[in-house]
A protein has these predicted regions:
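Short glycine-rich hinge loops at helix-strand junctions in the catalytic core
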Residues: 82
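Phosphate-binding beta-alpha-beta segment of Rossmann-like dinucleotide-binding domains, i.e.
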Residues: 1-61
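Hydrophobic/small residue at the entry helix of a nucleotide-binding pocket
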Residues: 70
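Adenosine-phosphate binding glycine-rich loop
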Residues: 191-215, 224
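Gly/Ala-rich phosphate-binding loop of Rossmann-like dinucleotide-binding domains
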Residues: 75, 79, 164-165
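Hydrophobic Val/Ile/Leu positions in short beta-strands of Rossmann-like dinucleotide-binding domains
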Residues: 62-64, 87
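Rossmann-like adenosine-cofactor binding region
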Residues: 90-187
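Short, flexible hinge/linker loops that cap or flank conserved catalytic cores
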Residues: 54-58, 79, 138-139, 188
Length: 226
């Protein structure tokens, strides 16, 4: 659940351009000669750092690559934002399962081309290798977003940086990387339209174990009480 929450947080953050907003805010950017004035309910300085584009999640198509336990939890949470949630995976869900989760299936390439944000939720193994490279980023909708809370080695980081620098992608939210900790000379650190977190999406093992034991205790109690 914690990873799903983190993924949704990053999805919200990239749509709202929180990374760029904070950078400009801390740098003291004020457009159109704005000066600080006491605010009231009706008088305030709207978007004084001059964000060119920021949006909400309502009505956006979010494409989930992989729909296991975490991907399903992400889909459930995105329903609260009234998103159009599409998914792709090797074995398609049944129609009933899709209706329960509120998702629709798309082939991989079609999902990339039609989503406003693509969120990666596949497992990594050596056989899988890179799932998101130059071809895949090139297929993505212009000015869309990319989020990865799965594994860093699923992504060609050079291709991602190129897609961000060319502004084909509007932004990315990343919690995982090819090398961890992230190398200090990584271009991702100097790409302004990224939000980076230090592989912290999952809750600590002790907290997770306590939660799982609590859930197990509830199930046992429910079973005993009939």
């Amino acid at each position: 659940i914690s990873v799903a929450e983190h993924a949704v947080m990053l999805i919200c953050a990239v749509f709202k351009r929180l990374g760029i907003a904070e950078q400009r805010f801390r740098a003291g950017v004020m457009i159109d000669g704005a000066t600080p004035e006491l605010t009231t309910q009706e008088s305030y300085a709207y978007n004084w750092v001059g964000l060119e584009r920021f949006e909400g999640l309502y009505g956006q198509t979010i494409g989930l690559v992989g729909l296991g336990k975490i991907g399903s939890e992400v889909a459930t949470r995105l329903r609260a934002f009234e998103c159009d949630v599409a998914y792709t995976k090797r074995n398609r869900l049944s129609e009933d399962e899709e209706q329960t989760l509120g998702v629709r299936y798309l082939p991989f390439d079609e999902l990339l081309a039609s989503s406003h944000c693509v969120s990666l939720h596949n497992r990594f193994d050596e056989a899988t290798g890179i799932m998101m490279g130059a071809r895949e980023f090139g297929l993505m909708r212009p000015r869309s977003f990319f989020v990865n809370t799965a594994r860093g080695r699923l992504v060609d980081e050079e291709a991602l940086v190129a897609a961000l620098e060319s502004e084909h992608l509007a932004g990315a939210g990343l919690d995982v990387f090819q090398y961890e900790p992230l190398q200090t000379d990584s271009p991702l650190l100097h790409t302004p339209n990224t939000i980076l977190t230090p592989h912290s999406a999952g809750i600590p093992i002790g907290v997770s174990l306590a939660w799982e034991l609590g859930q197990a205790g509830k199930k046992i109690s429910n079973a005993l009480s009939g």
